Amino acid sequence: MTFMNSIILYILVGAASGTLAGLLGLGGGVVIVPTLAYIFSQMGISHDHIMHLAIGTSLTTMVFTSFFSTLAHHKYKRVEWQVVKKFVPGIIIGSILGTFLSNQLETKSLTLIFAIYLILISIQMFIKSNSDLNKSTKKSKLKESYPILTLGGMGVGTLSGLLGVGGGTLTVPFLTLLRKKIHNAIGISAASGLFATLFGTISYIGFSLGTPNLPEGSFGFVYLPAVIVIALVSSIFAPLGSKLSGVLSAKVLMRVFSIILLFISIKLLVTYVT
């Protein structure tokens, strides 16, 4: 793959991840990680490091994406900071645990886990796209308490650190169980994702510094050229996604995206696992 081709792909994935972050509360890792895995494989990077490098790079780019998405949601008063504050301690613990586990796994195992995660999320999103998005807010009896939010944060943080995702696919459904309206859940998810990816990035770099046979421009398992382009583009598109979230049909978007995720997961399994 030529340098220009990789730059074009970085721009496209940055636009997609930024829009998704603002639109559905997703950090964009579900798009960034598989795309980077493909790009890195075409660059001739060691197969042993492809997924780790993709995950570490994804986490770093989403720090910027989540930051600008959070600012946009805060502007529209969709971020309940009292909830975020209770969420953060668990997220920090989970992020460190997740990145530690990720660094212990081989690329094949990580890819299999990531592909299964995408399949489960695609099914979840498709089912939810055919139901009332605020249904759980009416029926759930789960209370918004510090222990519940801490445990939820640990789950989100672990997932984020392990797979290089923002955790929105867990955070939004979890918050709707706490009777949060969908748009508020997305705003809280964006803010929580900022802390999950920030501490996940710090931990991932710490665990991977000194790893041999990484490409030039890497800082541990973070490939800086990709970070710069994707972060810049996604930061531009995140506010756009936030604006669109109040206009476009979330059900239709979730249905389409669930199908895309299913195809991506199958491609990952065929390419890197079989």
Residue ranges and their predicted role:
Residues 1-24, 31-52, 66-158, 176-184, ...:
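Juxtamembrane transmembrane-helix boundary motif
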Residues 18, 55-62, 189-197, 261:
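Transmembrane helix-bundle signature of multi-pass membrane transporters/permeases
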Residues 28, 198-203:
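Hydrophobic alpha-helical transmembrane segments that constitute the membrane-spanning cores
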Residues 170, 174-195:
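Small-residue-rich alpha-helical segments with characteristic i,i+4
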